[in-house]
Structure formats: C-alpha cells, structure tokens
C-alpha cells in the first residue's frame, strides 16, 4: 500500500508499504545502510542489509535524490523519540530512483546557511524547508477558513477582471500594452467592479484576489499582493465591522486555535494620532504620547522656548521604570529624524534623581522634569521629547515608540490587539502636489455632518471610512460608498477631476448609478499581512511563495526584464534611455 512518510504508524507494522520522497541523510554502518526519507508529511527511516539487492543503490544515494521504495514496516531497535515515526523503520526490498540531485546551494533545514539572495534565487529549494512548508500549510487553512465562513453567510465568490483601467488609488499602476496600441492597467483593487456587483444585485460578494501597486516597497509590502475583498449591500459601518469581527474570530479559531474577544476596540483617527503618533497603533504596549507644553512655559532651554513662541508642540513618551542609555537614544533619534524632527531630547531619572540625559546642562529646567515624573507617578524612568509642529512631533514619536518597543522587547508575538480606526478625514494634503487628495479613495461617502460642505471645506471633511489594525499593521480598510451620481461628481471635481475626465475614466460607474443602486459598503483585508502576523514574521516575503525582493525583483526569474526590439516593435513601443 502507498503511504506518506510521516503517516507510518502502528497499523502498518509487518506490512509492505510503498513510499515516495526526498533523501535527507544516508548513513552506512558496517553491513547496514540507513536513509532518512522525507515528504511533506514527515520523515521516516528506511534501511537495507548488505545481503539485500538494493544495498548498493541505497549507499550511493545523495541528499535530495527523489526515490520510490517498497519494504516491510518493522519496529526500530533504537527508537527516535524526536520523530513522529521514530518507533518504526522500513526494510527496503525495492527501489526506484526518480531523479538524482546535485549538491544544493543551501542547507535544506530549518536553520540554513544561505543568505536571502541565495534563498530567493533557489526558492523552490528554500520552500522544501519544514519552516516554510508549515507557513504555506497554514496559509492554505486561512484561505479555507475565510471561504467557509463567508459561504456560511451566503456570500457569492466572484472573480473580477485583472486586465482593467487605471484607477486613482494612490499608487502608480502597472500598465499592460496590447498589440492594438492601447493599454490595460492591473487593478490596485477591484473597487469599481465590486460596486457594480452591488448594482447588479449580488448583495454579498467576496473574492480572494491579487492586486498590484507600483510603489516603494517596505518589509510589509509587495508589488503584487493578495487581499480578501468583501462588499455588502443594505448595510452600514456597524454591520460590516461586526461581520469582519466574527469572520476573523472564526479564522483565528480554525487556524491557530486562538479565541478572539469581540467586539474590537474602536478609536478615532484623531485619538490614534494624539496618543500613538500613528493611524495604525500597536496596542500590545502602552507608551502613549503626551503633550507637555504647559510644563515648559518657563523653560530656560532655548529650543523649547522657540517651539512655544512659534505655537508648536512639545510632545513626549514617558518610559516607566527603565533608564534608557545614550546608545539606545541615539538609535531612536535616527527614527525621529526620519520623520522630520530636528532631534530627540531625553532625561533619565532614578529614585527621583536625574541621572542622565541630553538636557542636563540647564539646571533651572531640572525642576520641570522632576515635576513631570511626579505628576505621572514615576520615581524611576526616562522621558523622550520632541519639540516641533504637532504633526512632525507626533509622527516622529510614533516611529520612536514602535522601535522603542522593539528595544524593550514589548511586542509579544502571541498577543493579538485589534482596533478599528474610525472618523477619518475625507482628504489628506499632498505637499508635493500642493493640493488635497482623497485620503482613501474617491468613492468614500462623506459623513452626514459634512455632506453639504465636504468639497468646499476639505480640511474639516470627514469620510465614512474604517481601517482595521492588528498589532501595528493596517490589516484592512473600507468605507461606506457613494451611491449618488451628483455626490460622486462633486467628489471627483474636488480632487481636480473634470466632468470630461470623470466620464472618460468612470463613465461606466456613473451610468450604473442611474439604474437603481443599493446602499453598500465594503472592505479589503490583506491576507499576506495577516499571515505575517500569524507566523510572527517581520517580512511579507516570508509568507509569499515566490516573492519579490525590496527592489521589486524576482531573483529566481530575473524579472522584470528587458524586452527585445521585435516585441517592442509589435507593441508600438520604444524605450527611451535617460
């Protein structure tokens, strides 16, 4: 009978079995040869004696050879308790060598000797490692759990086109030239398609789909990524948020056996920026940001005086019971400067005595720092300060906060802190373009309070948007959609899109609004980011089977690559060298 290597058990004793797998280790011991044979499901020991006809073939095997063997299952004289199959071994009678393997360029074990470039160039070998196989087994279970729950709630799974038109989603599009001298764009999201499915009467739609964004890459980004896309008719924010909470509760229970507590916390965008300096706060630890302007009204420190004179903010993180050192603060200061801060000031206190810091020289201000610590009930600890505009100080300390938590080991991997970020601005100001742009996308419905003035008073306009954040990562975002053609046209005009341009780009959607549109809302959940968190990885490429590196390059395929002149000519394209 054919059996997987990892499934050999008591029921197979004294029976002939057929196994297939990869050779992991060959050990010749006198008149015996032992081979560790592995498949996806586990590893088992096989052996032959010198008198067996297969002895020589087994001794000549190499690591990663792919073989088929037939033999008798026996109890091992010296069991290996570290293996699930460690009580058994197979006495081989027949062997078929499917394929011989060269010496691999990396050690195919959980702990490998290869750097990332080698691992990704030979990704098919890297994926043989158990640590990677387990990631993709879990990923498969996550897919199944999402589908099972949404099917149970009467959702229709529907594919939408990959070859589409450009959309104003905030990142650059990938374009696909055609032989007709026209271009498709790969979708940054199925946004307009899923809204049209609501017009079509689907009411409950989802798909697990690929999306594409030609943007700067980070550890949690890939140019192509997978999202669970959901849209729901005759529903509002509360209904879809409740749906997503129940969905994630089911997925976590089914995949990693974790019971999530619902409902999730809700926090306004303004509160997130005020307290955490980020619209995706990590709530596994405290370290809230405080505004301390009133403490420094009589400060003798020049840059504090200047900040208050210019109506700027003095913001701080208080670190209880920990005395940071100069090296740690210098590391954190680099992150503050990355967000535009001029520097990161600090003071450390122990048993109510100032012991270290960058602000020691001005003795008159020591009473200020002692008062701050006293008011926050701290006799020992550190304080990190940034004096700048409110936005710069908040963003700088937000990034400092995240990296401080890493230094202090506060990011516990098995704690899952969800939060809904709500009450979003409808627009954000693009300093480079010198104008307001849609904060999420231009299909978001303004709040009732700002509906009449959203396109005039853009700074105060609010949208019916919501992001779901998990452990400092934006897991997903969504909104209640505009369903009125006139409101949609106002929104387009407010982001400098003329009626002519709107008709050219979105005429199909505007026309659909003339034929009866149900109120609807939706969300897209980043499946890759969810997988990052589930397996406690810092890099999205660890949970993608064939990822791109930080430069957007597929090391295995050497893609993107140049096109030959003949193909360019057929498409009517010419590459212009800078």
Curated annotation (Swiss-Prot):
Gene Ontology cellular component annotations, sorted alphabetically = cytoplasm
List, in alphabetical order, the Gene Ontology terms for molecular function in this entry: aspartate-tRNA ligase activity; ATP binding; nucleic acid binding
What keywords are annotated for this sequence in UniProt? Aminoacyl-tRNA synthetase, ATP-binding, Cytoplasm, Ligase, Nucleotide-binding, Protein biosynthesis
Q: Where does ATP bind?
A: 213-215, 222, 474, 526-529
Q: Respond yes or no to whether keyword S-adenosyl-L-methionine is given for this record.
A: no
Q: Which SUPFAM superfamilies match?
A: Class II aaRS and biotin synthetases, GAD domain-like, Nucleic acid-binding proteins
EC id? 6.1.1.12
Q: Where in the cell is it found?
A: Cytoplasm
Instruction: Report residues binding L-aspartate.
Output: 169, 213, 440, 481
The first-level EC class reads ligase
Source taxon at top rank? Bacteria
Similarity-based family: Belongs to the class-II aminoacyl-tRNA synthetase family. Type 1 subfamily.
Subunit relationships = Homodimer.
* Function description: Catalyzes the attachment of L-aspartate to tRNA(Asp) in a two-step reaction: L-aspartate is first activated by ATP to form Asp-AMP and then transferred to the acceptor end of tRNA(Asp).
Name this protein carries in UniProt: Aspartate--tRNA ligase
């Amino acid at each position: 009978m054919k059996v997987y290597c990892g499934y050999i058990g008591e029921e197979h004793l004294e029976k002939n079995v057929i196994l297939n797998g990869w050779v992991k280790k060959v050990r010749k011991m006198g008149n015996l040869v032992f081979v560790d044979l592995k498949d996806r499901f586990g590893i088992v020991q096989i052996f032959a004696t010198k008198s067996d006809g297969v002895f020589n073939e087994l001794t000549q095997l190499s690591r990663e050879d792919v073989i088929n063997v037939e033999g008798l299952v026996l109890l091992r004289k010296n069991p290996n308790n570290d293996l699930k199959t460690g009580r058994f071994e197979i006495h081989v009678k027949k062997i078929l060598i499917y394929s011989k393997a060269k010496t691999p360029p990396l050690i195919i074990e959980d702990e490998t000797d290869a750097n990332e470039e080698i691992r990704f160039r030979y990704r098919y070998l890297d994926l043989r490692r158990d640590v990677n196989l387990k990631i993709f087994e879990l990923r498969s279970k996550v897919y199944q759990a999402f589908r099972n729950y949404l099917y149970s709630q009467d959702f229709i799974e529907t594919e939408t086109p990959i070859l589409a038109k450009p959309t104003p989603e905030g990142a650059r599009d990938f374009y696909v030239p055609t032989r007709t001298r026209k271009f498709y764009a790969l979708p940054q999201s199925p946004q307009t398609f899923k809204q049209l499915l609501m017009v079509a009467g689907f009411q409950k739609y989802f798909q697990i789909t690929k999306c594409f964004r030609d943007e700067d890459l980070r550890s949690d980004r890939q140019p192509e990524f997978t999202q669970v896309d959901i849209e729901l008719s005759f529903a509002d924010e509360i209904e879809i948020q409740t749906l997503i909470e129940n969905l994630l509760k089911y997925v976590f229970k089914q995949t990693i056996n974790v019971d999530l507590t619902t409902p999730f916390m809700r926090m306004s965008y303004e509160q997130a920026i005020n307290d955490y300096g980020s619209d995706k706060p990590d709530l596994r630890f405290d370290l809230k940001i405080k505004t301390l302007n009133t403490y420094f009204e009589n400060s003798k420190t020049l840059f504090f005086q200047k900040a208050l004179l210019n109506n700027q903010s003095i913001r701080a993180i208080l670190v209880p019971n920990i005395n940071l050192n100069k090296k740690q603060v210098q590391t954190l200061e680099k992150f503050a400067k990355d967000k535009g801060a001029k520097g990161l000031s600090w003071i450390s206190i122990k048993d109510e005595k100032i012991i270290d810091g960058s602000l020691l020289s001005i003795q008159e201000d020591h009473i200020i720092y002692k008062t701050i610590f006293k008011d926050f009930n701290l006799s020992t600890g550190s304080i990190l300060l940034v004096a700048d505009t409110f936005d710069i100080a908040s963003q700088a300390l937000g990034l400092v906060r995240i990296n401080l938590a890493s230094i202090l080991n506060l990011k516990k991997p098995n704690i899952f802190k969800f939060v809904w970020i709500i009450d979003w601005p409808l627009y954000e100001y693009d300093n480079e373009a010198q104008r307001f742009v849609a904060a999420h996308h231009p299909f978001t419905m303004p709040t009732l309070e700002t509906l009449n003035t959203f396109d005039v008073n853009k700074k105060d306009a609010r949208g019916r948007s919501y992001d779901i954040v998990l452990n400092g990562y934006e897991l997903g975002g969504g909104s209640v959609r505009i369903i009125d053609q006139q409101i949609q046209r106002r929104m387009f005009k407010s982001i400098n899109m003329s009626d002519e341009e709107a008709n050219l780009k979105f005429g199909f959607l505007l026309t659909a609004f003339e034929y009866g549109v149900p109120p609807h809302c939706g969300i897209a959940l980043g499946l890759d980011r969810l997988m990052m968190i589930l397996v406690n990885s810092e890099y999205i490429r660890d949970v993608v089977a064939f990822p791109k590196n930080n430069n957007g390059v597929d090391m295995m395929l050497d893609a993107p690559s140049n096109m030959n002149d003949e193909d360019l000519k057929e498409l009517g394209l010419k590459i212009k060298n800078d």
